[in-house]
């Protein structure tokens, strides 16, 4: 009897809305996708963009750069974006905030949460407007400790039920760490993004080196890379240098480095990601490709 009453109420509800049961099920499918999908917010010092898996578009990914207003903070720009952004207005409940701030990497077997704040203060500058958080990188046997702006964090927390905050470089580190096992020679990686150069290397399933330099100059980038190359004792004939991202003066940079490092390579995202459809999205940063190319399961975690 109880089941009949429930069925009658459901039928009456559908009749009032002039929907049949099949239409009702179809109508809830987009809502379920919104509930389950994790929106990615990429925030740097001067840019904002949003991305989410979307099966209704050809590339299976909806990427939306946002034009920031100069003179106001990233947090203030994000508040404004919630009024106009197509993705932000969809009502996603889960978000992954990627922040581009200096990262202190701690070996996972040496990480002590009670000591990390003091260690961070000795290594980095923590502004009053920032709060310090950490993120475990299990594949790399490290913990990333970094700062996030309090106002930016508050804006995201106010709009989403489930929020994760990760370093912008996490996807790049993980992707290139997997590729580092190809071949027997040592490899140095240089990733260019947002007027910043990230240089890092791996060995025995962990970081051997990682540092970042603020530059958009190909000449300065070349100097920084070769300085690290020499510091790490790499072989200029046998070992490998891999460049990726938004490389300034790409042809000049590669040719200039080839004079000193014979095995210098520039990543081709189309080949790197096996012709994945997302590589055709104009303006999609390499770091976002590394997150989404593995599919909806990884991007929604």
Predicted regions and their residues:
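N-terminal Rossmann-like FAD-binding beta1-loop-alpha1 element of flavoenzymes
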Residues: 1-18
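Hydrophobic/aromatic-enriched cytosolic interaction surfaces used to assemble or bind macromolecules
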Residues: 19-301
